[in-house]
């Protein structure tokens, strides 16, 4: 996209949100992606956590016993720390009203937070969320995660491309194009760098999560999150936006997943068979 004024960006974001909510609330849901070459997995719900509908979730990550979350929309963006044990908010910092927050990730003592079309990455203290410095980058910012084994950050920009960045300078160090059956997978959104080296990515305006080999860009599994949306009541779905937010619980095979303005965080496993009672 070309340059936009703050008012135009806010209007575009609001319109996008309305369209996304309409799409998700429609009786015609997005059709899950399928492939003959990679497995389609589903979600086994282990536990559900209730929360308010105040979070336009853009970044979602667990470090130790803390859940970090970054949210979006100009004038409403914030980043917060939440206790993983009690799901109570520990700290919260609002972004300046002209910034549209996007993905977040923790690397060492630093929490990185990117922005949508502002070209600004903010380095924060992991424990206090205090801003330490800012770095400029080109293009849009959508999702972000830390691949510690490779000493790099992985960033999405809404296309099929993942960009690798230096965790200290935030300089771009390379890219990979994400493909499924040889075709590019566009609209990659929130990211999670998992313990096994895979990168998980929400696909915007769908209930799909792609499991990606970051070395080749090949999708190795497609996860269908539709049952999570279907499990919520009509009142829970009211005002809820798109599926977005993946955070692995360290050292386990479980993940926390949610969506923008979703009132529920789901603790799930990704399995190849739907548990009895889920559809």
What are these regions (language model features)?
Residues 46-78, 92-105, 142, 259-263:
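Beta-strand-rich domains and repeat architectures in extracellular enzymes and scaffolds
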Residues 33-54, 84-90, 235:
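A short helix->beta-strand "capping" segment at the edge of beta-propeller domains
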Residues 68-74, 111-118, 153-159, 201-205, ...:
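Conserved beta-strand positions in repeat-built beta-propeller and related beta-rich domains
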Residues 53-64, 97-108, 137-152, 182-197, ...:
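Beta-rich, blade/repeat-based domains predominating
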